[in-house]
Every structure is written in C-alpha cells, then in structure tokens.
Amino acid sequence: MDNQGVIYSDLNLPPNPKRQQQKPKGNTSSILVTEQEITYAELNLQKTSQDFQGNDKTNHCKDLLSAPEKLIAGILGIICLVLMASVVTIVVIPSTLTQKHNNSSLNTRTQKARHCGHCPEEWITYSNSCYYIGKEKRTWAESLLACTSKNSSLLSIDNEEEMKFLTAILTSSWIDVFRDSSHHPWVTINGLTFKHEIKESDHAEHNCAMLHVRGLFSDECGSSKIYHCKHKL
C-alpha cells in the first residue's frame, strides 16, 4: 500500500519548468510559418493579377480578330439578299407584264363593247354596231325572223377583228350565212359570197353556218341553236 502511494505522488508532481520555457520556441516557429504563408499568398495574388491581365489581352485580341469575320458575314448576307431579289424579279416581272398586257387588251375590248345610248340596255355595242345576246334556242329560219322582229338581222361577220371579238364573248350562235346545198357556195342573206372559211361536216344536209369558239362550222338548219342579233348604227 505504501509503495502504491509513492507512485501516485510521483505522478502528480508539478510540470517541469524547463518544458515551460520551451513554449516560446513554439511561438517563434508559428510566427515564421505565418510569415511564409503571407509571402506565399502575396506571390499567388501577383500571379493571379498577371493571369487576369493576360486573359484580358487575349480576349481583346479575339474581339479584334472577330471584326473582319463579322464584316464578311454581313457582305455574304447582302449578296444573298441581292440574289433573292434578282430571282423574284426574273420570275414575277414577266408574269406581271403578261397579265397587264392581257388586262389591257380585255379593257380595250370592254370599252368598245360598252352599252351605248343608241342601243337598248340588254344590247352591247362594238365598232358602231349593237349586238343582242340571246339565250333561247331556235332553228336558223326562226332565229332569222326573231332578229327581224327586233329591228335587226341575224348575226353577221364583216371582218377578222369582229370575229375575234365575237368568239371572245360568245360560245356559239347562228350567223346569217347559208347555202342551197353542199354543191353551192356559202352566201349571206344579202346574196353576197361569204369569204371566211367554214369547216364542213360529213352530213350533206348541214347547209347553215354557226359561229363557235373554235371557228365557223356547218350545221343542220332545222336544229335548235342559240342565236344572236346585230344592228348597225
């Protein structure tokens, strides 16, 4: 028991004064480490500043180099727009001119075919003549009498220009041309020889003439067809 008590007292001895005197050395070492860390931090800051300046110069150079590329892209864009405009011009303008020409021709014919004060309202006028646009169908002889009752004559054709006008506004009609037989010439109701070509059919009894969109044709006089009348001013 006494031996154990001695050991216990030895373990509870106060600290060695020499060990306490060694603490300032530890503080000096800490100060040195702190100075080294500060120096290292300053070096890192200088390096970071240099890297930032270098990156700024590099980005500035990139901006300077991208300017010509932007210029080239702009020029290419303008060229594309010019090419597109040229294509549109080549395609659109000819069709527009053609349409204007057709409209001009139609307007000219329409102006010539306006209602005239000398003609009834249901009639149209063209080149000093009034035209009745019929809707009912009659034989050639009946059509001739119907036009006479309207103080006019069955549709007649005086020249090529008039025939073009009539084929533009009419689908078909009897005209004042007939013949006695297939062995006789075509004549008008005034007894004048008809100068325009009439396309013959295979039927010998087709001795009356009709106006169609595709030209003049012979037809059977007894068949019912649409007729139109003409009155010269």
UniProtKB/Swiss-Prot annotation:
Extracellular side: 94-233
CDD domains (alphabetical): CLECT_NK_receptors_like
Motif (Immunoreceptor tyrosine-based inhibition motif (ITIM)): 6-11, 38-43
Glycosylation sites: N102, N103, N151
Top-rank taxon: Eukaryota
One Pfam short name: Lectin_C
Domain notes for this protein: The cytosolic N-terminus contains two immunoreceptor tyrosine-based inhibitory motifs (ITIMs), which are essential for the association with INPP5D/SHIP-1 and INPPL1/SHIP-2 phosphatases and functional inhibition.
Protein name per the record: NKG2-A/NKG2-B type II integral membrane protein
Annotated organism of origin: Macaca mulatta
Gene, per the UniProt record: NKG2A
